[in-house]
C-alpha cells in the first residue's frame, strides 16, 4: 500500500518508516 497511508497505521506496529 502507500507508504504515506501506512505511516499512520504502521506506526503502531513500527513499520511506518518504509
UniProtKB/Swiss-Prot annotation:
GO terms for cellular component: extracellular region. GO terms for biological process: adaptive immune response; blood coagulation; innate immune response. Keywords: Adaptive immunity, Blood coagulation, Coiled coil, Disulfide bond, Hemostasis, Immunity, Innate immunity, Secreted. It comes from the Eukaryota. Disulfide bonds: none annotated. Conversion of fibrinogen to fibrin is triggered by thrombin, which cleaves fibrinopeptides A and B from alpha and beta chains, and thus exposes the N-terminal polymerization sites responsible for the formation of the soft clot. The soft clot is converted into the hard clot by factor XIIIA which catalyzes the epsilon-(gamma-glutamyl)lysine cross-linking between gamma chains (stronger) and between alpha chains (weaker) of different monomers. It is found in: Secreted. Heterohexamer; disulfide linked. Contains 2 sets of 3 non-identical chains (alpha, beta and gamma). The 2 heterotrimers are in head to head conformation with the N-termini in a small central domain. A long coiled coil structure formed by 3 polypeptide chains connects the central nodule to the C-terminal domains (distal nodules). The long C-terminal ends of the alpha chains fold back, contributing a fourth strand to the coiled coil structure. Cleaved by the protease thrombin to yield monomers which, together with fibrinogen beta (FGB) and fibrinogen gamma (FGG), polymerize to form an insoluble fibrin matrix. Fibrin has a major function in hemostasis as one of the primary components of blood clots. In addition, functions during the early stages of wound repair to stabilize the lesion and guide cell migration during re-epithelialization. Was originally thought to be essential for platelet aggregation, based on in vitro studies using anticoagulated blood. This is Fibrinogen alpha chain. The gene is FGA.
